[in-house]
C-alpha cells in the first residue's frame, strides 16, 4: 500500500476524502491521511524515512518546509512557497499547485484584468496568489498585511502596492476584487466567525474571493453571496490544487467525471 499525507495546523477531511475517493475509483492500493505535526522537521524526516509518496503542505508551513526538501521545482522556487512534496526514493521535490488553482479560477470566472484588487495576507498562499495575479496581467493590486517586512517584500516583488491595514471603503479601502489569504474565517480558529474584509468593502467589490476551504462557506463568502457578488471559494481552490497533487503523486490524470464524483463525495460527508 502507498501512503500520502497532508500536514496542516488545522487538518480537515476534505483532502482525505477527495484523494481516497479517486484512489478507489481508479483501483489504486493507496491511502491518504491528514496530520497536524508537532514538529515539522521530524514530520518531513518521517516522509523521507517511511517512504511516504506524497505530502501536502498547508498553512502555516508553506515557507518553513523549504529548508527541509532536496529539490525545488520551478513552480515552488519562483514564489518561495511549497504546498506539495513528492518523495522519489528518499529524494524530496517541492512543488506549488496553489498557483495553478488561482490561475485557473481567475480564468474560469473571466475576472477582468483591469479590476483593482485588495489582497489580504503575505504568507505562502499570498505569494502564490500574487504571482498568479501578476502573470494574468493584473496591475492595480494592493497587498494588505500588518507585517510590514513580508507585506512590502511581496508588494515590491510583483510591482504592487502595500498597506498595513484596510481604510474605510470611502477612503480607498475598496476594490473590484477582494481576496482573503489569511486564516480569518477558518473553522476552528480564533477568528472563525469574523469577516476578513469590512462589509463596505464587500459591498463595493464585484468579485469576492476567499482561499479558506473550511468551512465551504466562510463568513466572507456568505457576505459576498448575500450581496449578489461573484464569489470564488476556497473549496474550489482546494479541489484544483488537490487534483494537481494527485497527478504529481500518481502520474495519472483522472477524467472530469471521476473528479466530479470525488468532489460530490467530499461535499456529501
PLM feature spans:
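Glycine-rich adenosine-cofactor-binding loop
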Residues: 96, 106, 110-138, 145
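Rossmann-like adenosine-cofactor binding region
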Residues: 160-231
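NAD(P)-binding Rossmann-fold cofactor-contacting core
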Residues: 138-158
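Conserved beta-strand positions in the Rossmann-like core of class I SAM-dependent methyltransferases
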Residues: 33, 141-142, 232
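Adenosine-phosphate binding glycine-rich loop
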Residues: 207, 211-269
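Conserved S-adenosyl-L-methionine
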Residues: 135-140, 226-230
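Phosphate/diphosphate ligand-binding glycine-rich loop within oxidoreductases
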Residues: 2-109, 215-217
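Hydrophobic Val/Ile/Leu positions in short beta-strands of Rossmann-like dinucleotide-binding domains
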Residues: 6, 119-120, 143, 210
Amino acid at each position: 500500500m502507498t501512503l500520502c499525507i497532508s500536514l496542516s495546523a488545522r487538518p480537515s477531511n476534505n483532502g482525505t476524502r477527495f484523494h481516497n475517493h479517486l484512489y478507489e475509483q481508479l483501483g489504486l492500493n493507496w491511502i491518504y491521511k491528514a496530520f497536524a505535526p508537532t514538529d515539522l522537521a521530524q514530520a518531513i524526516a518521517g516522509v523521507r524515512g517511511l517512504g511516504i509518496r506524497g505530502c501536502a503542505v498547508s498553512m502555516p508551513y508553506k515557507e518553513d518546509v523549504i529548508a527541509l526538501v532536496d529539490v525545488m521545482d520551478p513552480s515552488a522556487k519562483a514564489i518561495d512557497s511549497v504546498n506539495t512534496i513528492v518523495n522519489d526514493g528518499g529524494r524530496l521535490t517541492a512543488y506549488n499547485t496553489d498557483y495553478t488553482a488561482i490561475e485557473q479560477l481567475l480564468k474560469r470566472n473571466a475576472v477582468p484584468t483591469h479590476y483593482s484588487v485588495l489582497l489580504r495576507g503575505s504568507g505562502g498562499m499570498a505569494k502564490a496568489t500574487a504571482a498568479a495575479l501578476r502573470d494574468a496581467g493584473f496591475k492595480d493590486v494592493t497587498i494588505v498585511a500588518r507585517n510590514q517586512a513580508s507585506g512590502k517584500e511581496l508588494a515590491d516583488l510583483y510591482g504592487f502596492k502595500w498597506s498595513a491595514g484596510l481604510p474605510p471603503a470611502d477612503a480607498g479601502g475598496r476594490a473590484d476584487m477582494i481576496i482573503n489569504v489569511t486564516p480569518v474565517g477558518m473553522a476552528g480558529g480564533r477568528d472563525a466567525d469574523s469577516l476578513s474584509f469590512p462589509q463596505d468593502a464587500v459591498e463595493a467589490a464585484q468579485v469576492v474571493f476567499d482561499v479558506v476551504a473550511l468551512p465551504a462557506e466562510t463568513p466572507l463568502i456568505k457576505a459576498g453571496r448575500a450581496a449578489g457578488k461573484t464569489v470564488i471559494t476556497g473549496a474550489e481552490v482546494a479541489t484544483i490544487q488537490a487534483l494537481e497533487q494527485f497527478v504529481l503523486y500518481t502520474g495519472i490524470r483522472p477524467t472530469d467525471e471521476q473528479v466530479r464524483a470525488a468532489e460530490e463525495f467530499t461535499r456529501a460527508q
